[in-house]
Protein backbone atom coordinates (compact mmCIF):
# COMPACT_ATOMS: atom_id res chain seq x y z
CA UNK A 1 0.00 0.00 0.00
CA UNK A 2 1.36 3.39 -0.94
CA UNK A 3 2.20 5.59 2.02
CA UNK A 4 1.59 9.31 2.21
CA UNK A 5 5.34 9.87 2.17
CA UNK A 6 5.98 7.74 -0.91
CA UNK A 7 3.15 9.38 -2.84
CA UNK A 8 4.80 12.79 -2.71
CA UNK A 9 6.70 13.44 -5.93
CA UNK A 10 8.98 16.43 -5.99
CA UNK A 11 9.40 18.16 -9.34
CA UNK A 12 11.95 20.82 -10.22
CA UNK A 13 10.43 24.28 -10.01
CA UNK A 14 9.33 25.65 -13.41
CA UNK A 15 10.67 29.02 -12.30
CA UNK A 16 14.22 27.71 -11.88
CA UNK A 17 15.18 28.27 -15.48
CA UNK A 18 18.68 27.23 -16.45
CA UNK A 19 20.46 28.78 -19.45
CA UNK A 20 20.17 25.46 -21.28
CA UNK A 21 16.42 25.26 -20.72
CA UNK A 22 15.97 28.85 -21.82
CA UNK A 23 17.83 28.07 -25.05
CA UNK A 24 15.64 25.00 -25.57
CA UNK A 25 12.48 27.01 -24.99
CA UNK A 26 13.62 29.70 -27.41
CA UNK A 27 14.27 27.08 -30.09
CA UNK A 28 11.08 25.08 -29.48
CA UNK A 29 9.07 24.91 -32.68
CA UNK A 30 5.31 24.74 -32.27
CA UNK A 31 2.10 26.10 -33.76
CA UNK A 32 -0.08 28.51 -31.83
CA UNK A 33 -3.76 28.04 -31.07
CA UNK A 34 -4.96 29.91 -34.16
CA UNK A 35 -2.66 27.98 -36.48
CA UNK A 36 -3.81 24.64 -35.07
CA UNK A 37 -7.43 25.64 -35.62
CA UNK A 38 -6.59 26.53 -39.23
CA UNK A 39 -4.99 23.13 -39.77
CA UNK A 40 -7.90 21.29 -38.21
CA UNK A 41 -10.43 23.23 -40.26
CA UNK A 42 -8.58 22.62 -43.53
CA UNK A 43 -8.28 18.87 -42.92
CA UNK A 44 -11.89 18.56 -41.76
CA UNK A 45 -13.22 20.50 -44.75
CA UNK A 46 -11.24 18.28 -47.13
CA UNK A 47 -12.65 15.18 -45.43
CA UNK A 48 -16.23 16.44 -45.74
CA UNK A 49 -15.71 17.26 -49.41
CA UNK A 50 -14.18 13.87 -50.17
CA UNK A 51 -16.99 12.10 -48.32
CA UNK A 52 -19.58 13.85 -50.48
CA UNK A 53 -17.63 12.86 -53.59
CA UNK A 54 -17.23 9.26 -52.49
CA UNK A 55 -13.48 9.62 -52.06
CA UNK A 56 -11.43 8.28 -49.16
CA UNK A 57 -8.15 10.20 -49.02
CA UNK A 58 -9.36 13.23 -47.11
CA UNK A 59 -11.20 11.09 -44.56
CA UNK A 60 -8.02 9.25 -43.62
CA UNK A 61 -5.93 12.42 -43.64
CA UNK A 62 -8.33 14.22 -41.30
CA UNK A 63 -8.24 11.28 -38.90
CA UNK A 64 -4.44 11.25 -38.85
CA UNK A 65 -4.15 15.00 -38.33
CA UNK A 66 -6.82 15.09 -35.62
CA UNK A 67 -5.10 12.20 -33.87
CA UNK A 68 -1.70 13.89 -33.86
CA UNK A 69 -3.08 17.23 -32.73
CA UNK A 70 -5.28 15.77 -30.01
CA UNK A 71 -2.79 13.33 -28.46
CA UNK A 72 0.75 14.58 -29.01
CA UNK A 73 1.71 11.18 -30.43
CA UNK A 74 4.97 10.88 -32.30
CA UNK A 75 4.36 10.32 -36.00
CA UNK A 76 5.99 6.86 -35.83
CA UNK A 77 3.62 5.91 -33.01
CA UNK A 78 0.59 7.06 -35.00
CA UNK A 79 1.73 5.09 -38.05
CA UNK A 80 2.20 1.93 -35.98
CA UNK A 81 -1.23 2.04 -34.35
CA UNK A 82 -3.47 -0.99 -34.65
CA UNK A 83 -7.25 -0.81 -34.38
CA UNK A 84 -7.03 -2.91 -31.22
CA UNK A 85 -4.86 -0.23 -29.59
CA UNK A 86 -7.93 1.99 -29.37
CA UNK A 87 -9.77 1.51 -26.10
CA UNK A 88 -13.09 3.19 -26.78
CA UNK A 89 -15.56 1.09 -24.83
CA UNK A 90 -17.77 2.25 -21.99
CA UNK A 91 -15.62 3.91 -19.36
CA UNK A 92 -12.54 3.75 -21.58
CA UNK A 93 -10.97 6.66 -23.44
CA UNK A 94 -7.36 5.90 -24.22
CA UNK A 95 -4.91 4.70 -26.84
CA UNK A 96 -2.27 2.09 -26.11
CA UNK A 97 1.16 3.10 -27.39
CA UNK A 98 3.30 0.01 -27.81
CA UNK A 99 6.64 1.38 -28.92
CA UNK A 100 7.17 4.82 -27.52
CA UNK A 101 10.55 6.40 -26.93
CA UNK A 102 12.47 4.17 -24.53
CA UNK A 103 10.60 1.05 -25.74
CA UNK A 104 8.06 1.31 -22.94
CA UNK A 105 4.42 0.43 -23.47
CA UNK A 106 2.16 3.21 -22.28
CA UNK A 107 -1.05 4.98 -23.11
CA UNK A 108 -2.51 8.40 -23.76
CA UNK A 109 -5.87 9.58 -22.49
CA UNK A 110 -8.14 11.05 -25.16
CA UNK A 111 -11.01 13.54 -24.99
CA UNK A 112 -14.61 12.87 -25.98
CA UNK A 113 -14.26 14.63 -29.33
CA UNK A 114 -11.41 12.41 -30.50
CA UNK A 115 -13.09 9.31 -29.09
CA UNK A 116 -16.19 10.06 -31.17
CA UNK A 117 -14.08 10.70 -34.26
CA UNK A 118 -12.19 7.43 -33.83
CA UNK A 119 -15.42 5.48 -33.39
CA UNK A 120 -16.85 6.99 -36.57
CA UNK A 121 -13.60 6.29 -38.40
CA UNK A 122 -13.62 2.62 -37.38
CA UNK A 123 -17.26 2.30 -38.47
CA UNK A 124 -16.37 3.91 -41.79
CA UNK A 125 -13.42 1.55 -42.27
CA UNK A 126 -15.69 -1.42 -41.65
CA UNK A 127 -18.22 -0.12 -44.18
CA UNK A 128 -15.36 0.21 -46.67
CA UNK A 129 -14.51 -3.44 -46.15
CA UNK A 130 -11.30 -2.80 -44.24
CA UNK A 131 -10.41 -5.14 -41.37
CA UNK A 132 -10.58 -3.57 -37.92
CA UNK A 133 -9.70 -6.55 -35.76
CA UNK A 134 -6.77 -7.42 -33.53
CA UNK A 135 -3.51 -6.37 -35.16
CA UNK A 136 -5.11 -4.63 -38.13
CA UNK A 137 -3.53 -1.23 -38.89
CA UNK A 138 -5.54 1.88 -38.13
CA UNK A 139 -4.23 3.68 -41.21
CA UNK A 140 -4.42 1.51 -44.29
CA UNK A 141 -4.08 2.85 -47.82
CA UNK A 142 -4.01 1.28 -51.28
CA UNK A 143 -0.34 0.42 -50.82
CA UNK A 144 -0.73 -1.02 -47.37
CA UNK A 145 -0.21 0.38 -43.89
CA UNK A 146 0.74 4.03 -43.82
CA UNK A 147 4.33 4.77 -42.90
CA UNK A 148 5.59 7.59 -40.73
CA UNK A 149 7.00 9.20 -43.86
CA UNK A 150 3.58 9.10 -45.54
CA UNK A 151 1.95 10.87 -42.60
CA UNK A 152 4.75 13.43 -42.54
CA UNK A 153 4.08 14.25 -46.18
CA UNK A 154 0.36 14.60 -45.51
CA UNK A 155 0.92 17.11 -42.71
CA UNK A 156 3.49 18.96 -44.79
CA UNK A 157 1.01 19.24 -47.67
CA UNK A 158 -1.59 20.94 -45.49
CA UNK A 159 0.93 23.21 -43.81
CA UNK A 160 2.22 24.38 -47.18
CA UNK A 161 -1.31 25.04 -48.42
CA UNK A 162 -1.93 27.17 -45.33
CA UNK A 163 1.48 28.87 -45.67
CA UNK A 164 2.43 27.58 -42.22
CA UNK A 165 5.28 25.35 -43.31
CA UNK A 166 8.89 26.19 -42.67
CA UNK A 167 11.96 23.92 -42.59
CA UNK A 168 12.27 22.12 -39.29
CA UNK A 169 8.71 22.95 -38.27
CA UNK A 170 6.47 20.20 -39.50
CA UNK A 171 4.86 17.10 -38.04
CA UNK A 172 6.87 16.89 -34.80
CA UNK A 173 5.92 20.49 -34.07
CA UNK A 174 2.37 19.21 -33.58
CA UNK A 175 3.63 17.21 -30.59
CA UNK A 176 5.27 20.32 -29.16
CA UNK A 177 2.08 22.29 -29.84
CA UNK A 178 0.12 19.77 -27.80
CA UNK A 179 2.59 20.01 -24.92
CA UNK A 180 2.51 23.82 -24.93
CA UNK A 181 -1.29 23.96 -25.07
CA UNK A 182 -1.79 21.31 -22.42
CA UNK A 183 0.56 23.03 -20.00
CA UNK A 184 -1.06 26.41 -20.68
CA UNK A 185 -4.46 24.98 -19.80
CA UNK A 186 -3.78 23.68 -16.29
CA UNK A 187 -0.11 24.40 -15.51
CA UNK A 188 0.22 20.71 -14.59
CA UNK A 189 3.66 19.38 -15.52
CA UNK A 190 2.82 15.88 -14.35
CA UNK A 191 -0.16 15.68 -16.73
CA UNK A 192 1.99 16.83 -19.64
CA UNK A 193 4.70 14.32 -18.74
CA UNK A 194 2.20 11.47 -18.61
CA UNK A 195 0.48 12.39 -21.87
CA UNK A 196 3.75 12.84 -23.76
CA UNK A 197 5.23 9.82 -21.95
CA UNK A 198 8.48 11.54 -21.06
CA UNK A 199 10.73 9.30 -19.00
CA UNK A 200 12.08 12.32 -17.15
CA UNK A 201 10.27 15.43 -15.94
CA UNK A 202 13.30 17.38 -17.19
CA UNK A 203 12.11 16.78 -20.75
CA UNK A 204 8.74 18.28 -19.84
CA UNK A 205 10.00 21.42 -18.13
CA UNK A 206 10.70 23.07 -21.48
CA UNK A 207 6.94 23.61 -21.94
CA UNK A 208 6.79 25.62 -18.72
CA UNK A 209 9.40 28.00 -20.13
CA UNK A 210 7.45 28.95 -23.24
CA UNK A 211 6.02 32.40 -22.62
CA UNK A 212 4.49 33.21 -25.98
CA UNK A 213 1.61 35.67 -25.61
CA UNK A 214 -0.73 33.34 -27.47
CA UNK A 215 -0.65 30.83 -24.60
CA UNK A 216 -0.45 33.23 -21.68
CA UNK A 217 -4.08 32.87 -20.63
CA UNK A 218 -6.10 29.88 -19.55
CA UNK A 219 -8.32 28.20 -22.15
CA UNK A 220 -11.49 26.24 -21.66
CA UNK A 221 -10.62 23.27 -23.88
CA UNK A 222 -7.88 22.06 -26.18
CA UNK A 223 -8.45 23.29 -29.75
CA UNK A 224 -12.17 23.79 -29.13
Where are these regions (language model features)?
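Conserved catalytic core of the tyrosine transesterase superfamily
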Residues: 1-224
